[in-house]
């Protein structure tokens, strides 16, 4: 029994034990927002990991509608029970692939595949042998923000109580 088969058996057992009713497959769209494909647990089987779940990639910003047939391949190693779902739900992340006559291949613009290629390039070029990628969630709160654009000038003005210039 290979590692994936063992993990799939573990997932099936977890679904029975936790009375899972839905399987939620998570991916990011081209802008980095979470997207979901959700199926009832009855439709979930080993073929899901082999053939994936088909979806229209144009809805996610991945492809024009004429070439939008894509497949989501779940990664069993990412499975967990969603503690916030109102219905018992198992969640998994995975990979997005394009459908081709030669078989499915990873979609080169999917953020996960971009990062995998970056890691591969880094290792091949000898830059490093390990990479840590972390998103930086950053935002600013302004009390006022104004801008002006005229034929001779443009500019902006921002102000916030927390700014150094507002403290004496």
Enumerate the predicted regions with their spans.
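Glycine-rich, acidic/polar active-site loops that bind/position phosphate-bearing ligands
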Residues: 1-168
């Amino acid at each position: 029994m290979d590692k994936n088969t063992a993990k799939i058996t573990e997932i099936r057992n977890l679904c029975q034990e936790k009375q899972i009713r839905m399987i939620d497959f998570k991916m990011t769209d081209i802008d980095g927002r979470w997207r979901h494909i959700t199926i009832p647990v009855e439709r979930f089987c080993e073929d899901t990991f082999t053939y994936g779940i088909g979806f229209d990639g144009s809805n996610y910003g991945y492809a024009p509608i004429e070439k939008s047939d894509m497949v989501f391949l779940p990664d069993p190693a990412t499975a967990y029970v969603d503690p916030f779902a109102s219905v018992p739900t198992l969640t998994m992340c995975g990979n997005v692939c394009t459908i081709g006559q030669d078989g499915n291949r990873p979609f080169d613009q999917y953020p996960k595949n971009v990062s995998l290629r970056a890691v591969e390039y880094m290792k091949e070029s000898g830059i490093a042998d390990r990479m840590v990628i972390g998103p930086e969630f950053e935002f600013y709160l302004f009390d006022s923000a104004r801008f002006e654009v005229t034929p001779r000038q443009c500019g902006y003005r921002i102000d916030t109580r927390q700014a150094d210039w507002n403290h004496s």
